[in-house]
Amino acid sequence: VSVDCSEYPQPTCTTEHRPVCGSNNETYGNKCNFCNAVVKSNGTLTVSHFGKC
C-alpha cells in the first residue's frame, strides 16, 4: 500500500474524511494530512493501511 506524496507538503488540507493509518499507528484524517506528516518525518512514515488504525 502506498500513497503518492510528491505534491506535498501543502499549507492547508481539506476536512475530507478519508482516514489513512500510518506506520506509527496514528490515524490521519486524509491523504493531505498524512502526506504532510510524511514530509515532516523525512520520508520515514509509511502507510500501514487505508482506514482508521
From Swiss-Prot:
Instruction: Name the Pfam families on file.
Output: Kazal_1
SUPFAM superfamilies from the xrefs?
Answer: Kazal-type serine protease inhibitors (SSF100895)
The intrachain disulfides are C5-C35, C13-C32, C21-C53
- Cell location: Secreted
Q: Can you tell me which residues are glycosylated?
A: N42
**Which molecular-function annotation in GO is an example for this chain?**
serine-type endopeptidase inhibitor activity
Q: Which domain of life is it from?
A: Eukaryota
Which keywords does the record carry?
Disulfide bond, Glycoprotein, Protease inhibitor, Repeat, Secreted, Serine protease inhibitor
List residues of the Kazal-like domain.
Answer: 3-53
Q: Where are the residues marked Reactive bond 3 as a site?
A: T15, E16
- The main location is secreted
Gene Ontology CC terms: extracellular space
Q: PANTHER family from the xrefs?
A: OVOMUCOID-LIKE-RELATED (PTHR47729:SF1), SERINE PEPTIDASE INHIBITOR, KAZAL TYPE 2, TANDEM DUPLICATE 1-RELATED (PTHR47729)
Entry text on domains: Avian ovomucoid consists of three homologous, tandem Kazal family inhibitory domains.
| Protein name listed in UniProt | Ovomucoid
Organism, per UniProt?
Answer: Polyplectron bicalcaratum (Grey peacock-pheasant)
